[in-house]
Amino acid sequence: MSGIKQQNTQPAGMRTINTLYFYLTEGCNLACRHCWMGPRFETKDSRHATLPVELFETAIREAKPLGLSGVKLTGGEPLLHPHFKTLLEIVRREDLRLTVETNGLLCTPEISAEIAKCPNRSVSISLDGTDAATHDWIRGVPGSFDAARQAVRNLVATGTKPQIIFSLMRKNVDQVDDMVRMAEELGASSLKFNVVQPTARGEKLHEAQEALTIAHLIEVGRYVEQVLAPQAKVDIFFHHPHAFKNLKRIASGNGYGACGIFGILGVIASGHYALCGIGEQVPDLIFGAVGEANLEDVWRDNAILKALREGLPERLEGVCGLCLMKEQCLGACVAQNYYSKGTLWAPYWFCEQANNAGLFPASRLAK
């Protein structure tokens, strides 16, 4: 296919599609206990659906006139896609910003070198423990710890310093300090501590009481931001809602921007547009088939997208509706809120639990 060089021709007043999130595969080569997507386990003998290259190109072609400037390649596991290198070639050809989220098992020196050819790139690697016993237990496959560490080394060797993502739970919370040191030693650009979402497998993890309590999450978040981050040799981020973040760090813009929900759209492996990867779990949040539904029509006219643009943040309910940070936070994660409560305006579970426990910062609530 020839280069997709259309200029931004979106109608006046229509929001820009900044980034397409491509969920390239329905399968994954790990079986992570906390995954919010819940992809099917894939082996050499069991293959699952992947997004066709032609639909990848179609989505980009139709998004370019609407302002597209970047893509995120995620999954499932994006490196399982049989034509991953071809997808990278398309990204380079169209001069798009590239983000890749991977577990690292297939991030070989060759793949790392291909990623490095994309000039505007970022990569994140999941590492959920500082030892094989912890990481492999969480990820469900022996050897995944060593593979993930090697993936970081491969990327660094080819000029890409990845972000390491560490998902917090009872099994690994005592390794937070050691994880900072490991990230520094491996040459990562940053380390992000993720809160496990109660979606798909993550919901089961919460039900099994393997997730951290809200009080513990708040305590760890405060420790990471106030103690670890100032002295670390890599950038440190803790993924909690704006109401719990340090105002100085928010003002710095250093990784603490608002949710990009107004400028992103998902493309799932079945070849459908969706709010994001939540479309894999919630059919209500699928917006039409790529190549059949015109993207400009979807972006402009879809009832859910229109409701979000018109209703956020004013229609947020509960503690989120009262929060002084709602303009920045936008409900933290609308997809998670809809999954939990069946409404776009539901309060974010983290903030709701904190408020119910008397732990929500009073200074961040409207009087």
Report residues per predicted region.
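Short Fe-S-cluster ligation motifs
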Residues: T58-G75, L308, A346-K367
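Accessory C-terminal segments flanking Radical SAM cores
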Residues: H240-F360
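Conserved alpha-helical substructure of the radical SAM core
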Residues: S2-S122
